[in-house]
């Protein structure tokens, strides 16, 4: 998910290099998230991340540069990747509810180390919009090849 704050060009370069070196079709988590958002016609987003405020702000800027509006964002403030997996289901659920209050077109859980896939599936009806989990999106991206 690093392309979400480094910029999408990073993933595009990576994919291009991998395909040139291996001749194997290649995808990425963030590009798959964007594909799903486009397929949904979602432009107003709720963004859930485990990151620090500066990283969350960069994600917001990058998505706004792509024409999305970040209607609401919630971040846990962590800076160690291994800690992201220890964020409780209750905390993730509360973050989802917080951003859902802004009535976005879709919610993105942006970090493959956050255990959000089951909650995303379970909470879509509760919050009234699609929830895209980055780990689940990764599996979808690779299933396309």
Model-based region annotation:
Residues 1-145:
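Non-catalytic structural scaffold of enzyme domains
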């Amino acid at each position: 998910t690093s392309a979400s704050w480094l910029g999408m060009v990073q993933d595009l370069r990576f994919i291009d290099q991998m395909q040139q070196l291996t001749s194997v079709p290649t995808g990425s988590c963030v590009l798959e998230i964007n594909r799903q958002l486009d397929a949904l016609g979602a432009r107003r987003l709720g963004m859930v991340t485990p990151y620090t405020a500066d990283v969350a702000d960069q994600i917001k800027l990058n998505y706004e540069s792509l024409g999305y509006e970040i209607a609401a964002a919630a971040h846990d403030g962590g800076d160690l990747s291994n800690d992201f997996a220890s964020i409780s289901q209750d905390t993730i659920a509360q973050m989802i509810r917080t951003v859902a209050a802004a009535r976005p077109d879709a919610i993105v859980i942006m970090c493959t180390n956050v255990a959000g896939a089951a909650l995303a599936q379970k909470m879509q009806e509760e919050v009234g919009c699609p929830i895209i989990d980055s780990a689940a999106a990764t599996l979808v991206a690779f299933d396309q090849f």
